Amino acid sequence: MDREGPRGPRSGASQENEQWKKETLEDEFSGVRLQKLEQQRQLFEKKQRRKRQEPLMVQANPDATLRHRRPRRGEERFQSDSSWGLGVGSPFLQENVPQAHLPSGAHSALVTMSYVADGSGERAPLLSPRGAVYTRGNGPAVRHHLCWLPDSSDSDVEEVTMEDIPVISRPPQTNLANLRRGWLASPGPGISQEEKEEEVGSTDARVEDKTPSPDPDPDPTVNSDGDHGDLAPCKVEENTAQKNTETASGIGDEDREKGEVTESTETNYAPVASKVLQGDDGDASNHNAWNMTCPQPRIPGPRLGEDMEAYVLLPAPRDHMVQCRIVRNKHGMDKGMFPSYYLYLEAEDGVAHFLLAGRKRKRSKTSNYLISLDPKDMSRNGSNFVGKVRSNVLGTKFTIFDNGVNPERSYWVPDSARIREELGVVCYETNVLGFRGPRKMTVILPGMDSRKQRMKVQPQNDQDSILSRVQKGAGHGLLLLQNKAPSWSDESGAYVLNFHGRVTRASVKNFQIVHPDEPDHLVLQFGRVAPNIFTMDFRYPLCPLQAFAICLSSFDGKLAFF
């Protein structure tokens, strides 16, 4: 009994020691397991980050906070309008207008997209769109969602908010070089803040139209200055003829380009065609500007099946002033930095015939405007490309070319290719007043021969160009034009020009081109009539392409004017 007494405590201590060792091993195993789990988690997160950085993957912005937007007002009203057939797919809008010519601003999307990643790097197919935000003018909008179908329940879900995504149906591919139809013009969207600043807000430097009161029985072929064949005084509707002076040039210029973005192959669309020349629903001035009627007869538009490339290069008739409209479209992915411009001819049948479309090239060292016969395809390599306007670094000198090839790049051009032809040069000069004074322009054109045909100028290098010839004093065979200097009016405190009722809004872009020896004989005049609508009237020896290119140069920003 005495020997067994001490064994009891020793056995209890050994059991406690074994239990302590067991707990220690379990703690070590659990620690190793946690370390392995942590390493696996880090590897998984690293793999997910690499997958998200791959191209064509929708990436989330961790700094952005998702906000729940309240539904806009008037959704029920928009749905009721759509039920009455007033939507984009209405047959009333598509009866005489091809779907390809619906404006890109007719649809605007505010879509919240979500996708599901499952570690495999693949995504499920996209659900059929349950809708988007369709707006008409300033009307209401309806918000819908798009999402990716999940592949598994263990996936990571991320949301991305994408704004200003145009919802545009793919237009049919048609070649418009052979057959052209007359598409009616419609002005662009409402006025923006930049355009409000561009229009004159003060009386320091603006140009007012000092159109005299028309005679009781004016001769439609004689203008207010007594010149035959010039612009005749236009008759405006009673609700717009409140006074005889109309603003024509003002402070400010086009908003400057803030940066060049990578050029994409997006499709441009002409404004919606309509049978009546009308303005924006929310701007009464647009409506008034489009309802002005002029007693002077207009020239007929292009015939169906006529070669449009030859038509836009043909000089205007000698005894007629060709009246046109330019519509600017500033909606799209570029957010107004690279708008599109559409030229329409106001024909004698009361219909505006589409002639040309132009846009500024994005990936270019200097300002470069491409001009095409197709409003849907304004690319350099398109079959309907007819010309371009290129500027120097300062944006003060613009050269107009046709669709020929550059002779300095003959190493990759076939021998059968036609060398490009220079159609003119536009030079802008700075003035002492800067923005507070009118622009000074000089237009240099190739001369006309005895058959009233334009002389060909096809320089092989820069030393043979029109601008170099003028700088060297060899101006033989060239025609020099300049803008008509406005006069200062003490009564209105502004520079004034007589635009004969064709210009109704103040803008620094408004100008008149005349011959130096005949200041009362207008060759080209350009001015604003609505926020995104401008008139362009020209005559011999200009052709539609030359006149349109000169006006495009007026839209471009001038670095030398800063």
From Swiss-Prot:
Region (Disordered): 1-81, 179-294
InterPro entries linked to this entry: Tubby-like_C (IPR025659), Tubby_C (IPR000007), Tubby_C_CS (IPR018066), Tubby_N (IPR005398)
Molecular function per GO: phosphoric diester hydrolase activity; protein-containing complex binding
Residue ranges, compositional bias (Polar residues): 285-294
Chief location bin: cytoplasm
Keyword Mitochondrion: no
Key words of the record: Cytoplasm, Phosphoprotein, Secreted
Cited PANTHER family: TUBBY-RELATED, TUBBY-RELATED PROTEIN 2
Protein name as annotated: Tubby-related protein 2
Source species of the chain: Mus musculus
